[in-house]
């Protein structure tokens, strides 16, 4: 069989760099199309589109796509979501104070909207490639 390891090295981190790396690396899905056409794999291993966004509570407000300054003061970090609306990773750090249930619900809703927007862009790019 074939093993594919996808690695993203972040040379200079700033705000949502980690989440951007996760989303950008998904573009390697094009590799699987090529392997399918060449008969090297029988089935596309990609189970779902996914994307990652940074989010956090800054100054009592839920924010999406944090810059470095916001990220350094935020109460939460990131969400990786799927096309079907599932969450494959959620990082929360209540470093300055705990995140409330209301804030968490608001962050998840905000993040899912951001993930859906990124996935729509991924689909468009992959369809045009």
PLM feature spans:
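Polyanion-binding surfaces on beta-sheet-dominated domains and ring/shell assemblies
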Residues: 1-129
